Amino acid sequence: MASQTAIRRKLRARRKVREAAGERPRLSVFRSNKHIYAQIIDDRSGTTLAAASSSAVKTGTKTDTAAAVGRALAEAAVAKGVKQVVFDRGAYKYHGRVKALAEAAREGGLDF
């Protein structure tokens, strides 16, 4: 069962995403113990615009791999014409692998 802190963090992050999600696609992050997955979702049409995962990109440490996933996702999104997104980190803290993915996606051309 999730701790109360994690539940509050998840609800706070969801509220901020919901406020901005109407006009921009959402960059959703899922982190497992072994891999990290990210996708850009258009909630209005319910479609995935671009996706990347660490199972396809292998480079060194988990943090380096997360950064490579962020760069790959940004390249795919910019190729499809998506530049502005809302970052949905879920209940994950903005630290470590999640932060590395976000910073690499920003460097790759995404704006959030």
From Swiss-Prot:
Entry-linked InterPro entries: Ribosomal_uL18_bac-type (IPR004389), Ribosomal_uL18_bac/euk (IPR005484)
SUPFAM superfamilies membership: Translational machinery components (SSF53137)
Keyword list, A-Z: Ribonucleoprotein, Ribosomal protein, RNA-binding, rRNA-binding
Example of a GO biological process term: translation
A UniProt-annotated Pfam family: Ribosomal_L18p
A Gene Ontology term for the protein's cellular component: cytosolic large ribosomal subunit
UniProt keyword annotation of Ribonucleoprotein present: yes
GO molecular function: 5S rRNA binding; structural constituent of ribosome
Origin: domain of life: Bacteria
Assembly and binders: Part of the 50S ribosomal subunit; part of the 5S rRNA/L5/L18/L25 subcomplex. Contacts the 5S and 23S rRNAs.
Family note: Belongs to the universal ribosomal protein uL18 family.
Job of this protein: This is one of the proteins that bind and probably mediate the attachment of the 5S RNA into the large ribosomal subunit, where it forms part of the central protuberance.
Annotated protein name in UniProt: Large ribosomal subunit protein uL18
Natural source organism: Deinococcus geothermalis (strain DSM 11300 / CIP 105573 / AG-3a)
Originating gene: rplR
